[in-house]
C-alpha cells in the first residue's frame, strides 16, 4: 500500500526563471501519518446507482480530506472492472498521478483494481487521460484529486468521446 506522511513547517523557495519551487522545509511543526489500505466491498452498495442501463454515469466523490474518497474510488474501479452476474465487467483506465489508487511497484498494481483495468502510474492527469483515450479504448477513466483547470478540460474531452469518468475532487 501507499502510506504517506504530510509535513508542515517553514518553507524556503528557490527561484527558477519566472517560477519558483520549494527547496527546503525547516522548523517542522506537524506530521500527518496516513496509512493506505484497501476496503474491498465498501462500494458495493454504490454500484447499482452508477449505472444507466449498461452505461456508467460520470461520477465524482466530494468530501473532506481523510474520509475515504480514494478508498471508495478504488473499490468502484475494482467492482466495475470485475462485473457481476448481472453485468459484464468494464474496461477501466486509471491515471494514478501520485500512486495512491493502484500503489504500483515496478509497474504492477499492488492493490486489486480488477481484471480489465489498465493503469498509468506517475503520470499527470491531463496527459494520462488523453493517452488512455487515444490508445487503450477505455469505457471508464478513473482519476484521483481533480483540481487544476487542465484536469477538468481533459475530463470534458472524455465526456465528448463517450467515456465515463470516475473521480475525486
Where are these regions (language model features)?
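P-loop NTP-binding catalytic core
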Residues: 1-55
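Conserved nucleotide-binding/hydrolysis micro-motifs of P-loop NTPases
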Residues: 2, 11-13, 56, 98-101, ...
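A general structural motif
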Residues: 40-45, 119-127, 146
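P-loop NTPase nucleotide-binding module
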Residues: 43-97
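Conserved catalytic network of the ASCE P-loop NTPase/AAA+ motor domain
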Residues: 52-54, 65, 82-87, 109-112, ...
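Well-ordered alpha-helical segments embedded in enzymatic catalytic cores
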Residues: 72-75, 125-131, 154
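P-loop NTPase switch/communication element
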Residues: 81-130
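Conserved P-loop NTPase nucleotide-binding/switch module
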Residues: 136-169
